[in-house]
Every structure is written in structure tokens, then in C-alpha cells.
Amino acid sequence: MSEPIHTHQDSVEIAAPPEVVYGLVTSMERYGEWSSENCGGYWRKDASGTPGSGGVGDQFVGINRRAGREWKAPVEIIEREPDRRFAFVTGGTDANIALWCYTLEPSGSGTRLTESYELRNLPPLLQEGGQPAVDDRMDAMRTSIRATLEGIKTCAESDG
């Protein structure tokens, strides 16, 4: 794999145990409650017609809105370590557009939650828009990560 095009991470201290925070982080259908961009989504069904539930290999389709535009962002779960780590890749492992990772560490006050983002490959819209489009997208990611962390914190500290 080549070096990421862009990376960003941010953290928040949450006055709740890791198992509570992990339960929220892995509830992707709830991200619309916290994100400044995501407004919901759904688990894709497997060959038998059963929707995913967040296991490694399951796929979720996030519905995002920003600046008057709406789009779907399919992701594939690539790592799930209870109460410690949860990661997924936008576009699935084939397209490998962006890696999103949540790391949980026990802390004196409860849990330190870190959300990290790696832009690995440019999707067509960012390729067409050049560096200004990439810069705009990275600004949006920083805002979205902060909003998501604060939203999860508020939810976890108010008993989910």
C-alpha cells in the first residue's frame, strides 16, 4: 500500500466505560445522530438476504449530505476488537478510498476515544476537482470527526 494522501485524528475523553462507548461506535446506523455529514444509512444484505450486523466483512452504506449535495458511501468493516478497536474502509477493500478507525483506551475518567482518518485513494470527484476539492474535503473531515466524537461523548455520558 502506498502512503496515505492525507491523515487526521482527534480524541475525546468520555466519562463512560469502554464497553458503552464501543457499543455506540459500532452502531453505524446511529452515526447520523452525531456526524455533521452522515444522516443515516443501512446494512447491505448478504447472499442469503440477511443484513450485516457490523462483523468483519459486513458492508454498510452511509448516506451523507453536505453543501446541498447528497451521496452514498459504502464501507466495509475490516477490524472489530471488542471494547478496543473498530475500523472500516470507504469503497470496500477493493477501492480502498479511506480508512476510518476508532481506538478506545481505558482512562481515569472512563474512555479515551480516538477517531482517525486516512485518505488512501482519490475518488473521481476529488480527482476532477484537484487540490481545492481535496482541501475542502479534508476541512469537512476535520469538522465531521470533531462533531462525531462530541456526539458520541454526549450520548455515552447520558446513558446512550
What are these regions (language model features)?
Residues 1-3, 46-47, 72-74, 120-125:
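Short hydrophobic/aromatic-rich motifs at helix boundaries and adjacent loops
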Residues 1-50:
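Hydrophobic ligand-binding cavity/cleft-lining segments
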Residues 11-15, 76, 103:
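Generic structural detector for well-ordered beta-strands
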Residues 14, 64, 117-119:
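Hydrophobic beta-strand positions in extracellular immunoglobulin-like domains
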Residues 43-96, 107-112, 147-160:
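Glycine-rich portal/gate segments that line the openings of hydrophobic small-molecule binding cavities
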Residues 89-147, 152:
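Beta-strand/loop substructures that line and gate deep hydrophobic ligand-binding cavities in soluble
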